[in-house]
Amino acid sequence: MRKKLMALGIIFLVLIAGINVTKTIIQDNQAIDAFLLHVTLQGEYKIGDGEWKPIVAGEHISAGKGDVTLRGSLHMAFPNGEIVAPVSQNSSVVFFLDHLGGNVNMDGQEPYVFDSENNRIGKATCGEYWFIYGYEGAESEIVEIHLTNPHVYGNEFAIDEFLSSMRMYESGYFERMMAEDTAGLKIVGYCITLVAIIIIGIALFSTLIRLDVSKIMWYAGAAIFFAGTYFVADATNTYIWNMNIALTTTIFVLSIMLYGFFLGAFTSICFEKPFKKVGYGTMAVSGAITGGLLIFTLFSNTKLYDVFAVWIILQTITAAVLLVISCINVRYVKGMMRLVQIVFIISLIAMILDVVGTRYGWWQGCCCSSIVFIIQFFAALFAVLLV
């Protein structure tokens, strides 16, 4: 009873600390936003050679159906969308580019070119970054922005992000705001990674003394570790002067790939004997193909982000096979192992939903998997404390 009360006390302290940090971040961001007005583009857009359509706030514009051309005038606005005034000459506007290239055109001026894929910014700069654009036009002058997406998968929402993230640039305030916006997610990522390192350390010790649980600990530690690095990479804001754009993208993609693999391996090792061979065989094929894709990118000019679409197909098939086996296997296990199997089933369903959701523009990135993982991770920590 005393141990449980102590554990509940620790949980309470952690929750209160987290609430205080969240409250501070929210209040501080409100103060900073007063200095950085948003920028809206009032006008129209077209995809490829299609018809011009009005730009409507909150309406999805696909980045995967061809080049997108935006045309209209730039206006400063409050975060709620209320227009303040047209953007004036010699103002600095910041754009967020999610694997996009393009240019800004105005009558009588040379095109203003930006491209995250060319060598002007750095070698192999495939990734996300912020770009500062010096507006030289008159107030309410028509600008035309042409955006190109070199990828076939992964950044379906890039145009939406481009439009919603435009804001006035003020040196110092912008950088501080971006850092604080992602501080919470980075802290979560670092905490998860730290726990993973501890688990891997326990796995190493267990292997040395030949405990049966060592293999499970290795797979669990690896899956948790790459989940942590994913959160850190996803929260990394790359500014115009930061030359680590490609590195951040590589860590981001590898984290997703390796988390998926080790989650599958962890799931397979918990199967009952009739299903273990099928699970191991599935993961062996998945691991071999994943390794082949990584080797291919090493010895070719193909970027890691471009094999993401192929890996997604592989991961969908792998997750579907493991999901079917897990649903059958759950009938043969009892007690805590049944609960563990249900946890794996939920994780596999979340992964499949993320793949489909990203492909068809329902939501962005690993939304389901991230939420499911965080809930399961902290639930597991609390369960350990209560034991």
Predicted regions and their residues:
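Aromatic-lined ligand-binding clefts that engage carbohydrates, nucleic acids, or primary amines
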Residues: E82-M106, V143-I145
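Accessory carbohydrate-binding/adhesion or oligomerization-edge regions at the termini
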Residues: M1-A63, H146-E180, L208
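Short beta-strands within extracellular/lumenal beta-sheet-rich domains
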Residues: G64-A85, W130-F131
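Extracellular beta-rich ligand/substrate-recognition surface
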Residues: E59-L70, E117-G127
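Beta-strand-rich ligand-recognition modules
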Residues: V104-D160
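First transmembrane helix
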Residues: E170, R176-R210, A309-V330
